[in-house]
Amino acid sequence: MLIKAVHYLLCFACIYVLSHAEPIISQPQSFASFKINNDTTQNEGSCVYTVTISTSCSSISATRDHISLAFGDAYGIQVYAPRLDDPWSSTFERCSADSFRVKGPCTHQICYVYLYRTGRDGWKPDTVKIFGYYSKPVTFYFRAFLPGGIWYGFNYCSSASSFSSSSSSSSSASK
């Protein structure tokens, strides 16, 4: 009888705790105030990242839109690639994955990523995977059409409001 009471009490406690848990951001968010900061030098601890972006099978067949990428850590270090797409190749085709080498300042653990799209075609990324020398590989699950003209993505940094004020950037990306 005592064991049953303890079991019910533990079940109730688990349900109570889970019902009060804070949700994590599971959908990408727009970030209108996001700024690329070009104030610092591009040679500040140069690292190379591999960024693999998979395009959803429910995206359009191919996009000619311009796609930019920015990612970084909770300490304000930012890596920026102003244009990943290549209008002369088959970049960002439906059901495909494209990998890019992006050079930029060395970050700690990457905790945010934003994509920016300009153009009329539209595009639906599935995942963005970032591999860096000083951070564990990280995958962000977009699975949504990118709106045009606004930074759109995820920010899991603990100091979400402070990273854009002291960030550094790079502008070299190659496929």
Predicted regions and their residues:
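Regulatory, non-catalytic segments
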Residues: 2-175
